[in-house]
UniProtKB/Swiss-Prot annotation:
Residues that, per the record, bind Fe cation: 233, 239
Enzyme class: oxidoreductase
Binding residues for [2Fe-2S] cluster: 100, 102, 120, 123
InterPro entries to which the protein is assigned, alphabetical: RHO_NdoB-like_C, Rieske_2Fe-2S, Rieske_2Fe-2S_sf, Ring-hydroxy_dOase_2Fe2S_BS, Ring_hydroxy_dOase_asu_C_dom, Rng_hydr_dOase-A
Protein name: Biphenyl dioxygenase subunit alpha
Cross-referenced PANTHER family: 3-PHENYLPROPIONATE_CINNAMIC ACID DIOXYGENASE SUBUNIT ALPHA, CHOLINE MONOOXYGENASE, CHLOROPLASTIC
Species in which this protein is naturally found: Metapseudomonas furukawaii (Pseudomonas furukawaii)
Pathway assignment: Xenobiotic degradation; biphenyl degradation; 2-hydroxy-2,4-pentadienoate and benzoate from biphenyl: step 1/4
Gene name of the encoded protein: bphA
Amino acid sequence: MSSSIKEVQGAPVKWVTNWTPEAIRGLVDQEKGLLDPRIYADQSLYELELERVFGRSWLLLGHESHVPETGDFLATYMGEDPVVMVRQKDKSIKVFLNQCRHRGMRICRSDAGNAKAFTCSYHGWAYDIAGKLVNVPFEKEAFCDKKEGDCGFDKAEWGPLQARVATYKGLVFANWDVQAPDLETYLGDARPYMDVMLDRTPAGTVAIGGMQKWVIPCNWKFAAEQFCSDMYHAGTMSHLSGILAGMPPEMDLSHAQVPTKGNQFRAGWGGHGSGWFVDEPGMLMAVMGPKVTQYWTEGPAADLAEQRLGHTMPVRRMFGQHMSVFPTCSFLPAINTIRTWHPRGPNEIEVWAFTLVDADAPAEIKEEYRRHNIRTFSAGGVFEQDDGENWVEIQKGLRGYKAKSQPLNAQMGLGRSQTGHPDFPGNVGYVYAEEAARGMYHHWMRMMSEPSWATLKP
C-alpha cells in the first residue's frame, strides 16, 4: 500500500484472490494511519476472516442470565457458524455447533427455550443438552453387522463440534481454537474499562428486554470500529439532532455544548478500544434522561461503583463511554446496550443487541433503561438509524472500482497517545482520535497474516 494518499489517486486496484501474508500486511499501515478500502468489501478476504478471525477469537454469545436454568438454551452464531449455548445440569454452560453429524441439518431450530434434548428434523438423530449423540433411529438395523454382532458405530464419536466456553462477569464468550489464549488473557488491559458497566455491584448484571435483531447492509468492521474508537461522529454531525430532541424540556439548550474533555484507550494487545468524556454528563442526560443519569452519578449505586472501581479509574467522572472487544462485541456503558455484529458476507451484518442492567437496580431504573434503549439504540432507535445510514452509504460506495483505489485516512491523534496517564490505565490519548481504530485494524491484519499463535499471542 502506498505511503501517500496523493501517490495512489487514480492508481489501478490490485485484485487479489490468493491473499499472501505480505499482501495482507500491505492493507493496514498503522504508522501512517492508512487503510485499504478492500478490507471492507473483498469476498476472498472475508472468507479468510471466517477462518482466521472468527475461527480463532473469543466471540460474545450472550449473558449468563439468558440461560438461567438447566436445559435453557440460546441459538446464536460464531461468525457464520450456527451454535447452541446451553445451561448444563452442573450449572456450567456448553456451546456446540448447531449441526447434525449425519447430513448437517440444524439440530435446534428455535431461537431460545428449554430442552431435554435436541432432535434433528431430517433423520431423527437426537443429542442431549451436553451435545452427546444419544439416539439414532434404526441404529442396530442400519449400522450393525447382524452376523457378527459387531456394530462398529460409536455414538460417542458423532456429537457436534464443541467450542471452548468462558465467562467474564456475566458475559458468555466462546472460541473454536484450542491454541488461543484464555479469555482473561485475551481481554488483557481492556478489562477495567469493561468493568465500568459489568462490575458496579456485587450482584452483577442481568439482561432485560429480550434480544433485538436486525440486518444492516454493511461490513462488520465499520460497526466494530465505531464503538471501539469513534467519538468523533457523536460530537460532530451524526447524533446532534437526536441529542437535542432527547433533552428534557427543563434543560437550557444553551447548555447543549459539544463536550471537549475526554480520553480514548487502545489495548496493549488484541484490538480492543474505548473512549469517553470526562466531567460532562450533558450527553448522557440527553440520551438516557434524568433518572438514569442520576442513578449513574449520584446516590448509593454510584457510591458503591466508586468504591469497587475507583481505585482503577475515576468512574464517576466518565460519561458517554463506548467500547469494542475485538472482533464483534460492542457496548455503551451507562446507556448499557450491548451487541454482537454477526457477519453475513463482506457487505452485511446481523445486529443482535440486548440491554444489561445492575441486577440489584430498582425496578423503576430497569424500566428506564429498557424504555430509553428502545428509543435510542434498538432496531428503530434514533441513534441506531443515524449510524446505520452512514455505514450503509459507505458500503454502497465500495461497490465501485475507483472507490477502492485509494486509501482511507485514519490519522487522527497519530503518535499522541501514551501510557502513564494520571487517571486512566493503559495507552490513553485524547477522546477525538483514531488510536484505538489503528489498534483494531493492526490486530485484524496480524490475525489475518499470522496463522500461528506462536507469533500472535500476547
